Amino acid sequence: MKFTKMHGLGNDYIYVDATSQKIENPNEISRFVSDRHFGIGSDGLVLILPSEIADFKMRMFNSDGSEAEMCGNAIRCVGKFVYDKKMTDKSTITIETLAGIKVLEMTVENDKVVLVKVDMGEPILKAETIPVLSEKHPVIDEEITAKDYCYNFTCVSMGNPHAITYIENVSEFPLEKIGPLFEFHEKFPRKTNVEFVELIDDSTIKMRVWERGAGETLACGTGACAVLVASVLKGYVGRKATVKLLGGDLTIEWNESDNHIYMTGPATTVFEGEIDI
């Protein structure tokens, strides 16, 4: 299998052109290639496929083999992948995902994509659609307890579920201990991504993420979008902010005129290769 390893702010995936090679059992392949000791090493696997309703289709799998609806960092890399490999000559393209069709605007320098702006669509705030078991709409400050830990979560879906809470010192937070308690909490019928957020000022947010099916990652694009939405709903920031993740910064904007979230950030190719599967 021919592959390209890429990352968006350190959120790394193995990218495969599935328009030119047949990939069977992607769940198993994702578990294999993601292993950082016995595989290539990644947060998961991304397949680029033909689409009947967009320029390309993206399927993505977490490191545990589960299929995810969408990943903001991964979709930026998909844009770079198809442009840099001359699969398209357009700098604005559409990508079909399980979370709907996304529009990508790519900044190109020296015939290579360096920055990608993604129209992430409208945030989903209905509890049953996120989904989260709550009577609130929108779900702001839902008190959830797991073992001895209790937090007020604001819940948002960007095509995948996110639960956001605010703390004082995100750098020192024991995420590996507490993240999974809420990822698998009964309040979330399809599990959830969990974001712990520290407010820096009214246009800067610092966050760490416990990703559903992957654990802590260096960055999560949909998570950054969900965090901005939650922070606007709670009156903490304006509609455009810098979101600081372990792997770097994303610019997130919640556009008032169309209600869409726009995410801008880098995409980087690490290396290419072939592996027996």
From Swiss-Prot:
UniProt: substrate binding residues: N11, N62, G72, N73, N160, N193, E211, R212, G221, T222
Positions of the catalytic residues: C71, C220
Could be important to modulate the pK values of the two catalytic cysteine residues, annotated site positions: H162, E211
Gene3D superfamilies according to UniProt: Diaminopimelate Epimerase, Chain A, domain 1
One GO term describing the cellular component: cytosol
Pfam families, sorted: DAP_epimerase (PF01678)
InterPro entries: DAP_epimerase_AS, DAP_epimerase_DapF
GO biological process, one term: lysine biosynthetic process via diaminopimelate
Keywords: Amino-acid biosynthesis, Cytoplasm, Isomerase, Lysine biosynthesis
Cellular compartments annotated: Cytoplasm
Catalyses which reaction(s): (2S,6S)-2,6-diaminopimelate = meso-2,6-diaminopimelate
Signal peptide interval: none
Top-level EC class as recorded in UniProt: isomerase
Superkingdom in the source lineage: Archaea
Chief site of localization: cytoplasm
UniProt-listed Enzyme Commission number(s): 5.1.1.7
Gene Ontology molecular function terms on file: diaminopimelate epimerase activity
Pathway: Amino-acid biosynthesis; L-lysine biosynthesis via DAP pathway; DL-2,6-diaminopimelate from LL-2,6-diaminopimelate: step 1/1
Residue stretches in coiled coil: none
PANTHER family for the chain: DIAMINOPIMELATE EPIMERASE, DIAMINOPIMELATE EPIMERASE, CHLOROPLASTIC
Subunit structure: Homodimer.
Function recorded in the entry: Catalyzes the stereoinversion of LL-2,6-diaminopimelate (L,L-DAP) to meso-diaminopimelate (meso-DAP), a precursor of L-lysine.
Homology family: Belongs to the diaminopimelate epimerase family.
Name recorded for this polypeptide: Diaminopimelate epimerase
Protein's gene: dapF
